[in-house]
Amino acid sequence: MAEMGSKGVTAGKIASNVQKKLTRAQEKVLQKLGKADETKDEQFEQCVQNFNKQLTEGTRLQKDLRTYLASVKAMHEASKKLNECLQEVYEPDWPGRDEANKIAENNDLLWMDYHQKLVDQALLTMDTYLGQFPDIKSRIAKRGRKLVDYDSARHHYESLQTAKKKDEAKIAKPVSLLEKAAPQWCQGKLQAHLVAQTNLLRNQAEEELIKAQKVFEEMNVDLQEELPSLWNSRVGFYVNTFQSIAGLEENFHKEMSKLNQNLNDVLVGLEKQHGSNTFTVKAQPSDNAPAKGNKSPSPPDGSPAATPEIRVNHEPEPAGGATPGATLPKSPSQLRKGPPVPPPPKHTPSKEVKQEQILSLFEDTFVPEISVTTPSQFEAPGPFSEQASLLDLDFDPLPPVTSPVKAPTPSGQSIPWDLWEPTESPAGSLPSGEPSAAEGTFAVSWPSQTAEPGPAQPAEASEVAGGTQPAAGAQEPGETAASEAASSSLPAVVVETFPATVNGTVEGGSGAGRLDLPPGFMFKVQAQHDYTATDTDELQLKAGDVVLVIPFQNPEEQDEGWLMGVKESDWNQHKELEKCRGVFPENFTERVP
């Protein structure tokens, strides 16, 4: 009998729970469809949001703290193995062995104590703090279910209240029918029964509403008191937790520093006793690292190789005979650092010249370019005086001259280098720093470099019977004699002087060939790489574009490594210098004739 009773109770509870779930599901559907209103508490909803945020932060802190403790334990194991290795390599006869072993033991105990205190003062406190969240979370969920029950009971009671008149009409209608079928004495009892049944349903709905409201309000009041206090308690918990961790870590590092200092003292004593056996680590040069002196900048990929040049120190040298490491750069501009944009800067040789003279040697087949440089720019081997006039001859192949003026010397014959003979210069005609004729050098006398350059020569060179006409200034008697002596052994020399440019301004010369060029035109360059302009005053260049270089209006505005110019295509199309000109990096271009 007892078993039958327990089964009946269990079945009744199951049926009651199923009925509650169906009622709640029906109420939620009606609320979502908008056919039933929902009770809302914005203040409580804000407390629930804070609770969820606090739970998320606490869970993350607990996870990170466990990770920190795992790292401490791993560090403890690594330190323990390192100390064991030290004990193994420490010889028994070495001084301080006992102290080293004691330090290793204290180190191990210190790590264990640190880990245990972190667990007790941080991790366990964290677990206790988070232990209260599951219960509150379940109560919040239960409060939500009770709120649905309360809304359902309220809606049921309200529906009975609104349907009261309809029920009375339904009751009165059958009475009118019963009056015809039932006896007179039964009609009153039937009507009383229907009224009693309606009142019973209404009373039951009211009781359910009061009960649901009471349960909901009790849970709601408790949660509204606990949630704000729990939210405010997070500040004190965070402070205590991180203060404990910081204090434990500080004490740990203090004690660890003392142990490390003691170990260092033991090792210093060992080093003093065995000082003669000190092991010194020396840096070994890398086999792959090139020597600093042999490192030379290379042009960007795709740029043409540098043309072999002949360095002339009053003595002709073959193009392939240059010794490594002794190549003289044309100008210090090779060390110029280009704009910091890819491709890598191209070291374009440039030279600042006072005069340009082209000597047509070997009858228009090979024309050397003679440039006068200052002694500070020339680094020639051999003893030279600081006051001596030096020559830097760069022989670059140029197109043949159409109408050269030749001196009255044997013409039409090419004289090889091995047929040139040294010329003895008169005593005192050359400065003391220049090589003498006895050394087998090719002696040529030139005007002093300290003299100011004279006016530019006309385009047609004059013929001089004894040699070439000097570019500027007058020659001293000794220099004239040296020039005559040198010219007697020189082959046919063709002199053609081009107009000199001072700060980009052409002085002298015929301007018939430059009518279509912009004012102040200096020379042409061709872009070797694409360049994307980064400012409004810069030119946009593509590989192969030809740029006409012009001087800056204000020389002080010129930056190192930059030139002012206008693209040839833009100039030919618009002829407007102000709109078309701009600056561009010199190392992205190459000078063209």
From Swiss-Prot:
Illness the protein is tied to: Myopathy, centronuclear, 2: A congenital muscle disorder characterized by progressive muscular weakness and wasting involving mainly limb girdle, trunk, and neck muscles. It may also affect distal muscles. Weakness may be present during childhood or adolescence or may not become evident until the third decade of life. Ptosis is a frequent clinical feature. BIN1 mutations have been found in families segregating autosomal dominant centronuclear myopathy. Patients show adult-onset, mildly progressive muscle weakness affecting selected proximal muscles and all distal muscles of the lower limbs.
GO BP terms: cytoskeleton organization; endocytosis; endosome to lysosome transport; lipid tube assembly; negative regulation of amyloid-beta formation; negative regulation of calcium ion transmembrane transport via high voltage-gated calcium channel; negative regulation of potassium ion transmembrane transport; negative regulation of transcription by RNA polymerase II
N-acetylalanine sites (modified residues): A2
Stretch list, region Clathrin-binding: 378-421
Region (Disordered): 280-354, 400-488
GO (cellular component) term, any one: node of Ranvier
Subunit comment: Heterodimer with AMPH. Binds SH3GLB1. Interacts (via SH3 domain) with DNM1. Interacts with SYNJ1. Interacts (via SH3 domain) with DNM2. Isoform IIA interacts with CLTC. Isoform IIB does not interact with CLTC. Isoform IIC1 does not interact with CLTC. Isoform IIC2 does not interact with CLTC. Interacts with AP2A2. Interacts with AP2B1. Interacts with MYC (via N-terminal transactivation domain); the interaction requires the integrity of the conserved MYC box regions 1 and 2. Interacts with BIN2. Interacts with SNX4. Interacts (via BAR domain) with BACE1. Binds (via BAR domain) F-actin. (Microbial infection) Interacts (SH3 domain) with HCV NS5A.
Chain ranges of the SH3 domain: 520-593
Ranges where the record places region Interaction with BIN2: 2-122
GO molecular function list: actin filament binding; aspartic-type endopeptidase inhibitor activity; clathrin binding; GTPase binding; identical protein binding; lipid binding; phospholipid binding; protease binding
PANTHER family: AMPHIPHYSIN, MYC BOX-DEPENDENT-INTERACTING PROTEIN 1
Processing after translation: Phosphorylated by protein kinase C.
Tissue: Ubiquitous. Highest expression in the brain and muscle. Expressed in oligodendrocytes. Isoform IIA is expressed only in the brain, where it is detected in the gray matter, but not in the white matter. Isoform BIN1 is widely expressed with highest expression in skeletal muscle.
Ranges of residues in domain BAR: 29-276
Source organism phylogeny: Eukaryota, Metazoa, Chordata, Craniata, Vertebrata
Name of the featured protein: Myc box-dependent-interacting protein 1
Coiled coil, from the record: 15-42, 193-267
Residues where Phosphothreonine is found: T307, T323
Entry function: Is a key player in the control of plasma membrane curvature, membrane shaping and membrane remodeling. Required in muscle cells for the formation of T-tubules, tubular invaginations of the plasma membrane that function in depolarization-contraction coupling. Is a negative regulator of endocytosis. Is also involved in the regulation of intracellular vesicles sorting, modulation of BACE1 trafficking and the control of amyloid-beta production. In neuronal circuits, endocytosis regulation may influence the internalization of PHF-tau aggregates.
